[in-house]
Regions:
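Positively charged n-region of N-terminal signal peptides that target proteins for export
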Residues: 1-4
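Bacterial N-terminal signal peptides
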Residues: 7-15
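Generic low-complexity, intrinsically disordered sequence content enriched
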Residues: 13, 20-22, 53
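Signal peptide processing junction and immediate N-terminal pro/mature segment
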Residues: 17-29
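Beta-strand-enriched cores of mature, soluble protein domains
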Residues: 27-170
Length: 170
């Protein structure tokens, strides 16, 4: 009977130690998540298009035209550097389009150097592009490793174009 009591005591102590360790780990993760969220910043920058190369890749009479765009951008401000962008666009009507894209930005954000990828989703109507941006998870390199964020811009035909990006690091 005494051996069974000792075994039960050892198991109970082991379970309590594991539970306390998991609770401590969970509390640590919660604290880090709060710090990461509270440390988010907003980057404000302007950009200009250095190049824009648009080509049709599918067009059948009477249907929306599909194009592919390769563009390069130059950033100034809290984001400083170059962007290489690929868009896929669908023109609904003349002067109206929907598009998606990926852009690798290389340079610095808030004084941290490296690169990251932005995912673009937008529309073009009445001469104005409205774009939402999100940092692709896991795309940060260098000092921008662990970067996350969302932002956007509205742009007409009057460069430079203003944009914002709310960002943080894990």
């Amino acid at each position: 009977m005494r051996i069974i009591s000792i075994v039960v005591l050892v198991i109970t102590v082991s379970v309590l130690a594991l539970t306390q360790g998991k609770t401590r780990d969970a509390n640590q993760k919660t604290r880090v998540a709060r710090e990461t969220t509270s440390m988010r910043k907003q980057a404000k920058a302007t950009f200009t298009l250095k190049s824009w190369d648009e080509k049709n890749y599918d067009e059948i009479g009477g249907t929306p035209k599909l194009t592919r765009v390769s563009a390069t951008k130059s950033y100034k401000g809290d984001i400083d550097g170059e962007g290489n962008l690929e868009y896929l666009m669908m023109y609904r009507t003349a002067g109206s389009a929907s598009f998606i894209g990926l852009e690798r930005v290389t340079g610095s954000v808030g004084g941290r150097s490296g690169s990251f990828v932005l995912q673009h989703s937008g529309t073009f109507e009445g001469g104005v592009a409205k774009v939402t941006l999100s940092v692709v998870p896991g795309s940060g390199i260098g000092d921008l490793r662990g970067m996350s964020g969302e932002g956007g811009f509205e742009a007409g035909h009057q460069p430079p174009y203003a944009m914002t990006l709310d960002y943080g690091f894990e």
